[in-house]
Amino acid sequence: MMRSRLAVFLLAAVCAMVLTGCQKNVTLKVETEIPKPLVTKLPLSVGVYYPDAFRRYEYTETTEERGTWRIESGDSQVRAFNRILSELFSEFRELNSPQAGAVELIVVPEIAKMQFSMPKETGFDYFEAWVEYVVKLQTGDGEELPAWRFTGYGQARTGRFAGFETGLADSLSDALRNAGAQLATGLPAHPPVRQRAQRTGL
């Protein structure tokens, strides 16, 4: 009986050590290049205001299964939105305040959620990432307009010699590029934006 209990205790201790060893402390900074969108500029003057939470966005997670993750993407998020918005509208500028009113339309993006999955969790041979955005809109004189919500999705296959950090970073970069493509096509079609562009273009 004593040997049996000792064996169980040792097995539990070994399992705990293995689980602890599998936990990771990971810090990533997402870097990506957004291609120039092939779009026709809308005849609107637009300003974008980036809240600090967006400009410095950092995903953090600590769980027993995954360990501790810290993923920085704020700089890349700002560059991606600037890249797309500057090509979408005839006039574009960054604003220091969401109340600045020298433009016809003010865009205030927020990140609602970021998620990712790894091959060992899904059983597939690729990493996946999702970034959900809420784009708040208002006119230059402060009238709030219906917001637009969309999700960027990315995936990256596991490389034979690449670490999981590389695979995850690549899937997040892919999600940002996908978000840029959706922003380029979806925002101009969003009714409040489309209607104002049509009126201005008359």
Where are each of the predicted segments found?
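Sec-dependent bacterial lipoprotein signal peptides
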Residues: 1-22
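A structural "domain/chain start" motif
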Residues: 21-83, 188-202
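Surface-exposed short loop/turn segments
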Residues: 23-31, 95-147, 156-158
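Short secondary-structure transition/capping segments
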Residues: 37-41, 128, 134-150, 184-201
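Short secondary-structure boundary motifs at beta->alpha junctions and helix caps
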Residues: 63-74, 141-189
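Mid-chain, structured segments of secreted extracytoplasmic proteins
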Residues: 75-97
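Sec-exported extracytoplasmic/periplasmic mature domains
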Residues: 86-94, 180-188, 192
